[in-house]
């Protein structure tokens, strides 16, 4: 009989274990199902963030690459134009001119020096004329000519009538009023007896 109890107990344990196993599996499955439903949201959010970050990094890196590439292309273009471009044409023309001059009896070195001297002379004359023009303009301003010269040269009643339309009359009138106001202020200042107490009282 004990063996019968033993077999019955063993059978009961197996049945109970088989019942508990599916229950645990269903609980685990339901937990994992709930977690798996929540995780895809987190995973998709993380995936989107990683994707956006990687896209931003890619875009940034690609922009840097394009900038570097453009700079390299520009430098290459400059080097190519320097080698075979406009400067090359100018240098060939210069060489041809110097060869012609040397074949006509002028020394090559002398022709180069003469061209340099001509350019230098032209540059010096231009600088001198610019300086003279600036000096004349400043002298013209200092002497207070300008609009008055125009009026003296014009001399007709129509030209004088145009002063207001040109705005010079208004400007001259404002200047006259400013001069009168300055003179009145100076007269008042001279005639006033200002003491140190008055000055300190104003600024306190």
UniProtKB/Swiss-Prot annotation:
It comes from Heloderma suspectum. Keywords: Amidation, Cleavage on pair of basic residues, Hormone, Secreted, Signal. One of its GO terms (cellular component) is extracellular space. Belongs to the glucagon family. It is found in: Secreted. GO terms for biological process: adenylate cyclase-modulating G protein-coupled receptor signaling pathway; negative regulation of apoptotic process; positive regulation of insulin secretion involved in cellular response to glucose stimulus; protein kinase A signaling. Residues 84-109, 149-161, 197-204 form a propeptide. Induction: Produced in the A cells of the islets of Langerhans in response to a drop in blood sugar concentration. InterPro entries: Glucagon (IPR015550), Glucagon_GIP_secretin_VIP (IPR000532). Transmembrane segments: none annotated. The modification Arginine amide is found at residue 145. Residues 1-20 form the signal peptide. The keyword Nucleotide-binding does not apply. The gene is GCG. GO terms for molecular function: glucagon receptor binding; hormone activity. This is Pro-glucagon. Disulfide bonds: none annotated. The keyword Signal applies. Isoform LPII is expressed in both pancreas and intestine. Expression of isoform LPI is restricted to the pancreas. Neither isoform is detected in salivary glands. The record marks 52-53, 83-84, 115-116, 148-149, 163-164 as: Cleavage.
